[in-house]
């Protein structure tokens, strides 16, 4: 396989994103980002997952509150700046072995997987073994989802990234 540079397509973090990006690069196990709208929270998360999936073979998940939100916001949505689907900005074709459109799942040539899911249906994921999880729009998601997966991440020496805009004093506010 040819040498592939990640982050893909020359992406670099914006000034606001640099401190968080550094924490992710240095292996922080739990990162919470309470950023304003349009700050690039999912952008950082996608590029982080791409790198982590190449560094360690495992299952990586990106959860939004509802699976349909994940499909619309990240699987089907086209980045107007690049003309690529948002997930394609972080995961170049050269590292992908298979794309499952129905399951919103990528299988990479090194056998890692990355999948978009809804945190509202976390009970359907019993028996799974993620090593990296992003909880996007975490302020709107089911707080029980992270509580459910936290022991699995601890056992697997995994990591979690919680990203959202603050939406009042709720579970995300307390996490932050």
Predicted regions and their residues:
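Phosphate/NTP-binding elements of NTP-utilizing enzymes
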Residues: 1-176
């Amino acid at each position: 396989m040819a040498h592939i540079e990640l982050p893909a397509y020359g992406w670099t973090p914006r000034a606001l994103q640099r401190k968080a990006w550094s924490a992710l690069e240095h292996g922080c196990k739990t990162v919470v980002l309470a950023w304003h709208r349009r700050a690039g929270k999912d952008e950082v998360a996608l590029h982080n997952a791409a790198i982590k999936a190449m560094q360690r073979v495992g299952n990586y998940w990106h959860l939004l509150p509802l699976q349909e939100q994940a499909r619309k916001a990240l699987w089907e949505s086209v980045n107007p700046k690049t003309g690529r689907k948002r997930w394609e900005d972080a995961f170049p074709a050269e590292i992908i072995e298979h794309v499952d459109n129905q399951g919103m799942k990528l299988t990479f040539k090194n056998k890692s997987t990355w999948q978009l899911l809804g945190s509202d249906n976390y009970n359907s994921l019993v028996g799974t073994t993620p090593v990296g999880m992003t909880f996007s729009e975490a302020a709107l998601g089911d707080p029980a989802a992270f509580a459910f997966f936290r022991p699995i991440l601890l056992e697997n020496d995994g990591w979690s990234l919680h990203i959202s805009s603050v939406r009042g004093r709720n579970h995300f506010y307390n996490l932050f």
